[in-house]
A protein has these predicted regions:
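Short, well-formed alpha-helical segments that are part of the catalytic scaffolds
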Residues: 1-15
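Short helix-capping segments at alpha-helix termini
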Residues: 14-20, 43-48
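Acceptor/aglycone-binding surface of glycosyltransferases and processive sugar-polymer synthases
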Residues: 41, 50-56, 60-70, 75, ...
Length: 188
């Protein structure tokens, strides 16, 4: 429902600087609500947009793995289309990764989620620190940027149920955070 809005807002943000070329790899993870038709419309309108249509819902991390097989840029940005992160925040991740990091997560200073959602996020943070070796000072999120080198290493992992952050932590320890604004989820 928001994919067209997010893509066009992101294009607007990138066009303000003229510093970067961008491409979009949009994955429809088995949705039957017309999402892939919207992706095809965007791909017809913009030559730098391509779509991947998964046959069924394989889950967010499998969808991300599928997208990583198609990207070609120096940097790869992961972002949900639920509008919790405004495209105006992308430049913060780009600037931070250019300091020499392999991976940068957007860190939401104040989240606009329910108490239950915030609690489950906290539990995930503690679990990933204990089980996967995530550095204590790093806070993960669904808004991240990685280098091409990291993307190439990540797609070497062949797993039916990948946990993308866990793979990131195995591939690199050169990880940064940058604070970004968090908005109330529009959909999903």
């Amino acid at each position: 429902k928001t994919i067209k809005k997010v893509v066009e807002m992101t294009i607007d943000e990138f066009s303000k600087t003229n510093r970067y070329d961008c491409e979009f790899v949009l994955v429809n993870d088995g949705s039957t609500d017309g999402t892939y038709e919207k992706i095809k419309e965007l791909a017809e309108k913009y030559p730098f947009v391509q779509g991947v249509n998964l046959l069924r819902n394989f889950g967010q991390h499998n969808a991300l793995m599928a997208a990583l097989h198609y990207v070609r840029g120096d940097y790869v940005l992961g972002m949900d289309d639920d509008m919790q992160t405004h495209p105006s925040q992308i430049h913060k991740l780009v600037e931070k990764i250019q300091e020499g990091y392999d991976l940068v997560y957007g860190h939401y200073g104040k989240k606009k989620n329910s108490t239950l959602k915030n609690l489950s996020s906290k539990l995930n943070e503690v679990s990933s620190r204990i089980l996967l070796g995530r550095p204590k000072e790093i806070v993960s999120s669904n808004f991240w940027i990685i280098t091409r080198k990291v993307a190439e290493e990540v797609i070497k992992y062949d797993s039916y149920n990948p946990y993308i952050d866990g793979i990131f932590y195995r591939v690199t320890h050169n990880i940064g955070n940058v604070e970004v604004e968090h908005h109330k989820r529009e959909v999903g």
